[in-house]
């Protein structure tokens, strides 16, 4: 997968799976992103968003404790201009619709290596 690098952007990766976080970090770093932080739960994501204020958040939907959708809701309540991309191995239309209604800017499915990430990041950063 050869994608053109973008201008630098800071990102927060939220996933309870270390493997999934590493995969996202690798892809996003390859296209010009700088890791602002990692979170393993929804609660952790909300706190880290408040402290780090990244340009983009990549949030898993299903996590123990606070789900990604609830963390998205809390982040959007904190900052209505937050740019959150939901990530899941589940392609459930109801979850996608709910995430978009609550303010998610995009939705991608795992594995992230098969996603046109530079195009998605460019789109989300421009809106």
PLM feature spans:
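Active-site beta3 strand of CheY-like receiver
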Residues: 52-58
């Amino acid at each position: 997968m050869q994608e053109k690098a973008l201008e630098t952007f800071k990102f927060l990766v939220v996933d309870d799976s270390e493997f999934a976080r590493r995969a996202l970090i690798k892809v996003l770093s390859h296209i010009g992103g700088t890791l602002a932080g990692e979170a393993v739960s929804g609660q952790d994501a909300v706190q880290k968003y408040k402290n780090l204020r990244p340009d983009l958040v990549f949030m898993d939907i299903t996590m123990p404790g606070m789900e990604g959708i609830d963390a998205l809701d809390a982040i959007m309540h904190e900052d209505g201009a937050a740019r959150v991309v939901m990530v899941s191995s589940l392609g459930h239309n109801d979850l996608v619709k709910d995430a978009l209604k609550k303010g998610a800017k995009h939705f991608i499915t795992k594995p992230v290596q098969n996603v046109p990430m530079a195009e998605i990041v460019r789109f989300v950063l421009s809106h």
